[in-house]
Amino acid sequence: MTATIPPLRPTETSSNPDRPIADLKLQDIIKTLPKECFEKKASKAWASVLITLGAIALGYLGIIYLPWYCLPFTWIWTGTALTGAFVVGHDCGHRSFAKKRWVNDLVGHIAFAPLIYPFHSWRLLHDHHHLHTNKIEVDNAWDPWSVEAFQASPAIVRLFYRAIRGPFWWTGSIFHWGLMHFKLSNFAERDRNKVKLSIAVVFLFAAVAFPALIITTGVWGFVKFWLMPWLVYHFWMSTFTIVHHTIPEIRFRPAEDWSAAEAQLNGTVHCDYPRWVEVLCHDINVHIPHHLSVAIPSYNLRLAHASLKQNWGPFLYERTFNWGLMQQISGQCHLYDPDNGYRTFSSLK
């Protein structure tokens, strides 16, 4: 059963009427979620694996047997299905896929290998994002730069930042992947052996799979069977992650003014996508409950979100994926001022 709470009143919940949930503890919100949200069910977890494997197989059959002019459609399907593999690994990284850690680690490495994503590297960096969501200069996922940091950067860096926060937002996860996940200095000494293992796994996969693919199908086969679906996967990775925490209303705060409850409930966006995308990607778009507790498996996110809407509805941001939303994000959410919110690049002129 969901614990029902009375409607919140700013003066009753916070010393700051403009931030009515800032003084709440994260646990206060989690306690209102049904216990069923946290139940791991092996049948549902492995069903998600079967859905992903079936969708990927269907996509590759289409790439092989359908006429060449169908390739854009089969690439989109296959890349979206590969995003589902990432989400399976995502649950493994949060230990919400299986009860045994070794199962999570094994499945996570297998799911991430075709994406050339080092599992432990991602897991550790992603844990940091969850611990410091929307904390200025600490969060490592789409943390917007200040005007001062932007202006102090070299011209080439500013150019790349303009592109990624603007019309080329869909490449953002590629840069994040390449710059963050293979650099050992990004990780604590105690974690580096695990990171090295994960990097070795993806290097081994690439060393075996890529030459085999090129030898048997040529360079065009490499492009057709791996590169294009991989780019579609990164389109979704970039899109999902930027939408998760980037609309003009979302606030980023300095560490001394940061609230976990506010950041996770009121600093995260639920976005509806075409249903086939949500199915293939295992509801990764149902993101608010995931930020409240990473222990919620992906197949229970909708149950948790329904409870949040019932109890905390006024504090939730919900959007629908469309061109207008992406124009708003890429056209307005460029630089950040803690006092006034987002600023556009054009405002610097």
From Swiss-Prot:
The chain crosses the membrane at residues 46-66, 68-88, 102-122, 168-188, 199-219, 222-242. It catalyses: a 1-[(9Z)-octadecenoyl]-2-acyl-glycerolipid + 2 reduced [2Fe-2S]-[ferredoxin] + O2 + 2 H(+) = a 1-[(9Z,12Z)-octadecdienoyl]-2-acyl-glycerolipid + 2 oxidized [2Fe-2S]-[ferredoxin] + 2 H2O. Its cofactor is Fe(2+). A motif (Histidine box-3) lies at residues 290-294. A motif (Histidine box-2) lies at residues 126-130. This is sn-1 oleoyl-lipid 12-desaturase. The keyword Oxidoreductase applies. A motif (Histidine box-1) lies at residues 90-94. The keyword Kinase does not apply. Its EC number is 1.14.19.45. One of its GO terms (cellular component) is membrane. Pathway: Lipid metabolism; polyunsaturated fatty acid biosynthesis. Its main location: membrane. Keywords: Fatty acid biosynthesis, Fatty acid metabolism, Iron, Lipid biosynthesis, Lipid metabolism, Membrane, Oxidoreductase, Transmembrane, Transmembrane helix. It comes from Synechocystis sp. (strain PCC 6714). GO terms for molecular function: oxidoreductase activity. It is a multi-pass membrane protein. It is an enzyme of class 1 (oxidoreductase). GO terms for biological process: unsaturated fatty acid biosynthetic process. Residues 1-20 are annotated as: Disordered. The histidine box domains are involved in binding the catalytic metal ions. InterPro entries: FA_desaturase_dom, FADS-2_CS, Fatty_acid_desaturase. Belongs to the fatty acid desaturase type 2 family. Desaturase involved in fatty acid biosynthesis. Introduces a double bond at carbon 12 of oleoyl groups (18:1) attached to the sn-1 position of the glycerol moiety of membrane glycerolipids. Can also efficiently catalyze the desaturation of palmitoleic acid (16:1) in vitro. It is found in: Membrane.
